[in-house]
């Protein structure tokens, strides 16, 4: 039997106070701004449209979730919230083409091909990194499966609507995608060291040769599966009776969608030779790789990538953290853009995602990009890579009202995101955040003061 422990009243009050403070801090800092249907008029800002240049002293009207008007001296609709943005900048919401935010176990690495698993099934809408990335001006992310196997799971394109259910965050009608992976991450998963550490048996493939075979085998099976369904559907259309449909295969269905151009391939890769191999496989089976992810040696084969109609999403200045990253250079993205490749900068990190604006600025330093070209690497080009450029990525009338007000030029280290809108609703407001922090500090001080000096109760 456990002994009875008496806790003095003063100590109990202190425990309760601390627990209350922790709970209120966690919930208060994370509560989204209440949804508002009222229009918002942003006045007198420097508007970085990305696709149509810089507009000085310009107004922006957000209404019904869209960018309704752009111009000078716009009239405020009845009931509109008016924000004076004099001296401030407005740009499109940042798009991160490679993220693992909202998911914990990113790899279903038990098989070489796991095209049947879906990231959308495990999205965590309470991940605090959503809020932190909103504070960095990010509005849309491409949540990808990990890179442990040659053909991984299906991705999810997400709008960071903090405080909403996961289903409400899914980008409506975004083209679905799937994650592929080449190189060291796949082979390391199957190394002797990994086997000893996990106690699991080795899984094929263990070499780049094996990765190529896995791809060719998977698409051969997918092509045959597609042919079976095409034949069945054709016979049904002719009116034939007593037909038996092919058995449904959840592994091959997404790969058939790739063959039909209905699903994008986002392929983790580093070395030029392995990227060329994948482009050859795609050519053999008649599909296009939408993006090469990371692609640190992309500059070596920029012409071939452009000819294939493939995009590339890279880091601004990450290299030499593993052997296949040794030949990376900071000029990778500018060189690719020069060759006509739709290139972007991604984070692959909850932390770096909050500073993608600074990564874009590095493209000006390393490669001499213009302001618009640099901003496109974190906005419009990412929208193209995800197939949502008609909705987001630039400030144009009719597009989704995913915009960010910055304290200054977003390409400056001295600037910060002040207000982040998604579909015209505020999901991050810096002044509200600071006021909440101040309130919590005062609450803590009051709780400590209430207990300070009290004499403990002796049992």
Model-derived segments and their meaning:
Residues 10, 30-31, 37, 419-459:
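Extracellular/periplasmic ectodomains of large secreted or surface enzymes and adhesion receptors
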Residues 13-26:
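Bacterial N-terminal signal peptides
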Residues 31-36, 47, 51-91:
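Histidine-rich, glycine-flanked metal-binding segment
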Residues 45, 396-440:
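C-terminal cap of metal-dependent C-N hydrolases
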Residues 85-156, 164:
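Metal-associated gating/positioning segment near the N- to mid-region
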Residues 105-108, 113-117, 264, 303-306, ...:
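His/Asp/Glu-enriched, well-ordered alpha-helical/loop segment
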Residues 107-123, 164, 177-181, 186-197, ...:
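Active-site gating loops and adjacent loop-to-helix segments of metal-dependent hydrolytic enzymes
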Residues 134-293, 416, 422, 450-458:
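Polyanionic/metal-chelating signatures
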């Amino acid at each position: 039997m456990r002994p009875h422990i008496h806790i003095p009243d003063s100590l109990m009050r202190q425990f309760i106070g601390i627990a209350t403070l922790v709970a209120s801090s966690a919930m208060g800092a994370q509560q989204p701004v209440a949804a508002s249907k009222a229009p918002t008029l942003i006045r007198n800002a420097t508007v970085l449209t990305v696709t149509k240049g810089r507009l000085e002293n310009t107004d922006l009207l957000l209404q019904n979730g869209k960018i309704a008007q752009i111009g000078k001296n716009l009239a405020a609709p009845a009931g509109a919230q008016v924000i004076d943005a004099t001296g401030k900048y407005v740009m499109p919401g940042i798009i991160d083409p490679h993220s693992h935010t909202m998911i914990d176990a990113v790899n279903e690495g038990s098989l070489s091909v796991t095209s049947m698993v879906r990231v959308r099934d495990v999205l965590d809408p309470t991940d605090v990194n959503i809020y932190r990335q909103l504070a960095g001006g990010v509005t849309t992310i491409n949540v990808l499966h990990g890179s442990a196997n040659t053909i991984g799971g299906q991705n999810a394109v997400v709008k960071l609507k903090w405080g909403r259910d996961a289903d409400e965050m899914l980008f409506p009608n975004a083209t679905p995608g799937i994650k592929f992976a080449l190189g060291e991450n796949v082979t390391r998963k199957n190394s002797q060291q990994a086997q000893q550490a996990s106690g699991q048996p080795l899984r094929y493939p263990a070499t780049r040769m094996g990765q190529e075979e896995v791809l060719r085998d998977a698409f051969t099976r997918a092509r045959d599966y597609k042919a079976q369904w095409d034949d069945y559907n054709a016979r049904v259309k002719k009116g034939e009776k007593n037909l038996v449909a092919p058995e449904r295969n959840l592994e091959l269905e997404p790969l058939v969608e790739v063959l039909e151009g209905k699903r994008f391939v986002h392929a983790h890769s580093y070395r030029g030779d392995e990227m060329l191999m994948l482009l050859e496989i795609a050519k053999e089976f008649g599909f296009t790789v939408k993006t090469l992810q990371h692609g640190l040696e992309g500059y070596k084969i920029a012409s071939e990538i452009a000819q294939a109609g493939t995009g590339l999403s890279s880091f601004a200045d990450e290299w030499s953290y593993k052997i296949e990253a040794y030949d990376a250079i900071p000029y990778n993205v500018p060189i690719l853009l020069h060759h006509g490749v739709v290139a972007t900068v991604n984070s692959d990190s909850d932390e770096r995602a909050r500073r993608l604006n600074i990564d874009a600025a590095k493209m000006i330093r390393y490669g001499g990009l213009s302001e618009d070209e640099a901003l496109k690497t974190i906005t419009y080009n990412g929208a193209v890579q995800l197939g949502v450029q008609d909705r987001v990525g630039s400030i144009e009338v009719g597009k989704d009202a995913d915009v960010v007000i910055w304290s200054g030029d977003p390409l400056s280290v001295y600037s910060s995101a002040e207000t982040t809108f998604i579909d015209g609703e505020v999901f991050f407001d810096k002044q509200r955040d600071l006021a909440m922090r101040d309130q919590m500090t005062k609450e803590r001080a009051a709780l400590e003061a209430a207990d300070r000096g009290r004499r403990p109760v002796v049992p």
